[in-house]
Amino acid sequence: MPIINKLIEIQTEPKINIHNITPQIKELIASTSIKNGQVLVFSRHTTTALAINENEVRLLEDIKVFLQKLAPESDSYLHNDLHLRDVPEDEPINAHSHLMAMMLTTSEIIPIVDGKLALGTWQSVLFFELDGPRKRTVFVQISGE
């Protein structure tokens, strides 16, 4: 069974933003000969996450507000006591971003059927930047026959 590993690179915007990476995943699958199998999508960062949900602008705004309520940036967090940690000079104050990421997931597995993602009508693969702006990578592993 062939296994193909690829990366998706994303330049994110400040703060929290959500990117629909479904088109890039579809493009990667189309570039292979795999017709039936699965694709693993994995976020390689501790302040990013993935989810499968509807890519609707107002819902995405609701999700951002919901995440900010779960871990407000203005709250006090031990991780943000940079003077008590051995950190690089450019270390951001971002405990809230780590906590938001913990409420989501770092990976999704989606079936491939007849060369296409087996997503539902309103489903998209969403990449969550929780501590932007940054250059991010998403690991994609396509396997099957």
Protein language model regions, located:
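Active-site histidine-anchored catalytic micro-motif
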Residues: 1-145
